[in-house]
Amino acid sequence: MLFVCMLIVWITYCIFPCGFVRAEGQTKYSKDFFDTVEPIKMRDPLAVVLGAMDKGEVFAFTYADAVKFAGHSCPAVAGAYKSTQMALRALYGDEIPVRGNIKVSFKGDVDYKVNGPISQVVTLITGAAPESGFKGFGTAGKYGRYNLMTFDRDHAPDPKATCSIVFQRVDNGKKTEVTYYVEFVPASERMDKLIPLVLSGKASEDESKEF
């Protein structure tokens, strides 16, 4: 493990031989509320082991992070963020959740409705990944995230639901299921008119902002 950490430090200094240079500027969003949503704090033992952060520090995932990852804000992205936040609160209470210690199972296959896009936001926050995830160190796969996320194609959620997700702690087996119904999110009557205009590029600047 020491060798791995030393290798990472060596690579870093090869890339930045004159020291570290911080990126300039901040992302400028068109909506102020992106940065006002309650953040989700996560402990990540892997990040500590590999030197990305000091022991006792946490990752703070914001809704703006989810928007940046998805490239947009919509009911699916918002639902993914809030569903994950609620599930973690149910599993950990007042404790800070542990990234990489959570299994996630979606009802329905990856291409069922918006399971795919929602799952990516869940992965961002929890670290749980499908077969493409980090396999961990050694034969035991320590700190691995590989296959912590699965899709249950044999059990679809309520047809009216947008998605249904089971979150389970790896350490003690405690689990909770969150079912999200996008129909409960208030919709604007203007959307039906604005969507085709925006997608076709015919929307005015004001219509694009409204959308």
State where each predicted segment sits.
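Sec/Tat signal peptide C-region and signal peptidase I cleavage site
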Residues: C18-R22
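Non-transmembrane, aqueous-exposed alpha-helical and coiled segments at domain scale
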Residues: E24-G71, K82-F211
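Bacterial N-terminal signal peptides
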Residues: V4-P17
